[in-house]
């Protein structure tokens, strides 16, 4: 029974998503329908947290625009997500970057990671 549930969940998960980690800056494009029309909206931000697993996995993105910090959460396996593009890799020592919430400007920056990403999780 448990194996059957895992198989069903694997079928619903997307395989076209790139591998990204907390601290990376990504550009996430989502489909939005307004007034009967559909358009694509792009949100670029730093990955603050990845929660859950399987079909219910979510990602929280943080971005500073016009001096105000914004935070948005997205379901990774949602059919509304059109594409995910990695802009730059970040070098962090935390699994959750909630300390970015109160920061603006240079304090909200994450150091860029240069080098190969390890395959360990």
From Swiss-Prot:
Task: State the species of origin.
Answer: Chlamydia pneumoniae
Q: Does the entry annotate any disulfide bonds, and if so which pairs? A: none
State the name under which the record lists this protein.
Large ribosomal subunit protein bL19
Q: Which protein family is it in?
A: Belongs to the bacterial ribosomal protein bL19 family.
Q: Which keywords belong to this entry?
A: Ribonucleoprotein, Ribosomal protein
Indicate whether Ribosomal protein appears among the record's keywords.
yes
What task does this protein carry out?
This protein is located at the 30S-50S ribosomal subunit interface and may play a role in the structure and function of the aminoacyl-tRNA binding site.
The terms describing its cellular component in GO are: cytosolic large ribosomal subunit
SUPFAM superfamilies given in the database record: Translation proteins SH3-like domain (SSF50104)
Q: Which spans of this chain does the record mark as coiled coil? A: none
Picking any one GO molecular function of the record gives: structural constituent of ribosome
The biological processes this protein is annotated with in GO are: translation
**Pfam families, alphabetized:** Ribosomal_L19 (PF01245)
Looking up InterPro entries in the UniProt record yields: Ribosomal_bL19 (IPR001857), Ribosomal_bL19_CS (IPR018257), Ribosomal_bL19_sf (IPR038657), Translation_prot_SH3-like_sf (IPR008991)
Against HAMAP family, the record matches this protein to:
Ribosomal_bL19
């Amino acid at each position: 029974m448990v194996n059957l549930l895992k198989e069903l969940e694997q079928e619903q998960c997307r395989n076209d998503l790139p591998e990204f980690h907390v601290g990376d800056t990504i550009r996430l494009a989502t489909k939005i329908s307004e007034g009967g029309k559909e358009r694509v909206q792009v949100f670029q931000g730093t990955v603050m947290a990845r929660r859950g697993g399987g079909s219910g996995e979510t990602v929280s993105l943080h971005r500073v625009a016009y001096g105000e910090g914004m935070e948005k959460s997205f379901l990774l396996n949602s059919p509304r997500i059109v594409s995910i593009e990695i802009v730059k890799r970040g070098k962090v020592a935390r699994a959750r970057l909630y300390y970015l919430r109160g920061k603006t400007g240079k304090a909200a920056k994450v150091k860029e990671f240069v080098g190969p990403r390890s395959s360990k999780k």
